[in-house]
Amino acid sequence: MNNSLDYLAYPVIVSNHRQSTTFRKKLDFGHYILHKNRVQIVKPAVDTKPPMAHTHYILKLSKIQGEQKRIDKIEYENRQLCQKIANAYRGPAKVDCWNEYLSKSLNRESRNRELVRITMENQGILRRLSDRKPNYDRRSSEMDWQNSRRYIRNTTRYLLFQED
């Protein structure tokens, strides 16, 4: 591009000595600058931005809430353990290691009274049942059964049993 004679934007097969390259060079340079400006102004047609980040995708509130509940539970248990340790240090020394836990129910005595009452009632019912004698006669029930069998035999067309 140093020499205007060396420049031909559109080389021709047959060149003429009168052919002026400076005008053609100006036109081509103007088109080049125009093209360069257009390329700089152009915005991409393809969206290359990252997708919109929604907060509820990233910040899971239910997970945070569950984690907070778990932390609260751990802190509560830690406080309970600290209280037990403090009570152990404050209280008298206990050498034996088989102190069994007794349930500290508020209504244990009333439940025990109810259990004793029910047990006594059951024993009374059992005693009354065992003291009772049977009040039916075996001989009369057998006679009734034979009579009913005879009535059935007399009223049916076919025999019920061959051995009767």
UniProtKB/Swiss-Prot annotation:
The consequence of inactivating this gene is: Male subfertility. Sperm show an impaired ability to penetrate the zona pellucida and abnormal motility characterized by frequent stalling in the anti-hook position with the flagellum and hook of the sperm head pointing in opposite directions. Sperm flagella lack outer microtubule doublet 4 in 63% of mutants while doublet 7 is missing in 14.8% of mutants.
Print the keywords alphabetically: Coiled coil
Q: Which GO terms describe its biological process?
A: sperm axoneme assembly
Task: List the coiled-coil residues.
Answer: 61-88
InterPro entries documented for this protein: CFAP97D1/2, Hmw/CFAP97
Q: Which Pfam families match?
A: Hmw_CFAP97 (PF13879)
Tissue spec. comment: Expressed exclusively in testis.
- What does the function comment of this entry state? Required for male fertility through its role in axonemal doublet stabilization which is essential for sperm motility and fertilization.
Give the protein family: Belongs to the CFAP97 family.
State what protein this is by name: Sperm axonemal maintenance protein CFAP97D1
Q: What is the lineage of its organism?
A: Eukaryota, Metazoa, Chordata, Craniata, Vertebrata
